[in-house]
Amino acid sequence: MSTNTDLSLSSYDEGQGSKFIRKARETPFVPIGMAGFAAIVAYGLYKLKSRGNTKMSIHLIHMRVAAQGFVVGAMTLGMGYSMYQEFWAKRKP
């Protein structure tokens, strides 16, 4: 019974940084989506001063749609990449 607890507790020994790096290697498009989201939000907030005649609510909606579009695109590419690796790349013996 102690071996079961040892196996389940081994995931808690892993630090946050090493866990993030391991997950990033398993699914590389998730950190790309997160970085793109952060970059689009930062750029949108930077451009908030010089938005011109545009209402703030419209500017924020455009920023949200762009960030969501980037994340959905990264998720779609990641799904396609995973499907490629699982079904087509491993077929060659």
Swiss-Prot record:
Residues 90-93 are mitochondrial matrix. One of its GO terms (biological process) is cellular response to hypoxia. Proposed subunit of cytochrome c oxidase (COX, complex IV), which is the terminal component of the mitochondrial respiratory chain that catalyzes the reduction of oxygen to water. May play a role in the assembly of respiratory supercomplexes. This is HIG1 domain family member 1A, mitochondrial. The modification Phosphoserine is found at residue 8. The chain crosses the membrane at residues 28-48, 69-89. Keywords: Acetylation, Electron transport, Membrane, Mitochondrion, Mitochondrion inner membrane, Phosphoprotein, Respiratory chain, Transmembrane, Transmembrane helix, Transport. GO terms for cellular component: membrane; mitochondrial inner membrane; mitochondrion; nucleus. Associates with cytochrome c oxidase (COX, complex IV); proposed complex component. Also associates with respiratory chain supercomplexes.
